[in-house]
């Protein structure tokens, strides 16, 4: 994925948000088969299907993760059940500290659902 495509989607975000996006993508791309798919207003992280969406905000990165059930954590700000066995879980990433083992565990689980 070209950095310029990522930077285009996040052009209106503060520079630290672009740094967060690049750091998160670098970690996620260590998983097998991950493709970063730029859309008009966001980025999708795909394996066979999308397992996460990265949405720009001025001061933060809004991450939407797929899961089998709602993720129970105070970090999750919104959960939407999209089918009997799938939920979308929304959280804000405002600093590099938020890209931690807990978050990566959720991403690994979402990645497995997209196999």
Predicted features by range, described:
Residues 1-115:
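Charge-dense, helix-prone N-terminal extensions
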């Amino acid at each position: 994925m070209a950095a310029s495509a990522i930077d285009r989607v996040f052009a209106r975000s503060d520079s630290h948000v672009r740094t967060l996006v690049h750091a998160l993508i670098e970690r996620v791309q260590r998983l097998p088969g991950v493709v970063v798919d730029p859309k008009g207003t966001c980025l999708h992280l795909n394996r066979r299907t999308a397992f996460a969406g990265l949405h720009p905000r001025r001061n933060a990165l809004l991450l939407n993760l797929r899961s089998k059930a709602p993720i129970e954590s105070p970090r999750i700000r919104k959960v939407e059940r999209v089918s009997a066995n799938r939920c979308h879980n929304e959280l804000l990433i405002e600093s590099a500290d938020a890209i931690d083992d807990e978050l990566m565990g959720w991403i690994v689980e979402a990645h497995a659902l997209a196999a």
